[in-house]
Amino acid sequence: MDHMQQQQRQQVGGGGGEEVAGRGGVPVCRPSGTRWTPTTEQIKILRELYYSCGIRSPNSEQIQRIAAMLRQYGRIEGKNVFYWFQNHKARERQKKRLTTLDVTTTTAAAADADASHLAVLSLSPTAAGATAPSFPGFYVGNGGAVQTDQANVVNWDCTAMAAEKTFLQDYMGVSGVGCAAGAAPTPWAMTTTTREPETLPLFPVVFVGGDGAHRHAVHGGFPSNFQRWGSAAATSNTITVQQHLQQHNFYSSSSSQLHSQDGPAAGTSLELTLSSYYCSCSPYPAGSM
């Protein structure tokens, strides 16, 4: 009995001590299990203050005024207002960082795509280097011949024809060489002038006339006595041919006669024959030499 009574007294004394400690100058810290749940009106007012009024980091006085104004729409404390502004600024910074990262990534991807495209173009057969020469109208590549634009071929033909026309007009006096129908004349062909045909001397222009004087042929023609000189030359050529024929016949007959005659008689006959031949074939009169 005594032991049980003593335990009851200790329990009662301990309870009184806790009450006394609770009533003393040191308060008891009890954690609060409630959280701030903002209402729609409170969030609307805070966002207007942040975006419209430009309040980013309010001081203690502003926090107290904002908290007092927001208590009309629900329970709120000053620390709730302070943390809301801090959290909102952190979200804004994170959003800007993500946006900048997305833009940078997109730009880098576009740059990589452009670089890849340029690399492909640089490796293509058309940009690898100078191609082999080909005929007009065809391009020779790695896979075969590809026909080029026909307009370029027509322009090239027109230029060549215009150059040929200018050459013929300047040096040959020929006209009428044109290009394809509908082609515009080139300025080079339009500014050309037609020259008179020139006759170049093909034979010596100095000859000796009948009177022994030296005469020069006129450019583009010859004097009237040139025809007489030509006829005289033709006559002398005919006489020379006849003399050669007579010599051939003479030697043939003389050789046959020598075989039939004796030695001294043949020599005398040959001398008489030669003297008579030279006298008959000589163009000069007898006794003039």
From Swiss-Prot:
Organism: Oryza sativa subsp. japonica (Rice)
PANTHER family: WUSCHEL-RELATED HOMEOBOX 1, WUSCHEL-RELATED HOMEOBOX 1-RELATED
Protein name per its UniProtKB record: WUSCHEL-related homeobox 1
Composition bias, Low complexity: 1-11
Record-annotated DNA-binding residue ranges: 31-96
The family this protein is said to belong to: Belongs to the WUS homeobox family.
Major location (coarse): nucleus
Purpose: Transcription repressor required for the formation and development of tiller buds and panicles. Required for tiller formation and female sterility. Required for the early developmental stages of axillary meristem formation. Plays a role in maintaining the axillary premeristem zone and in promoting the formation of the axillary meristem by promoting OSH1 expression. Does not seem to be involved in maintenance of the shoot apical meristem (SAM).
Protein's UniProt keywords contain RNA-binding: no
KW RNA-binding (keyword) present: no
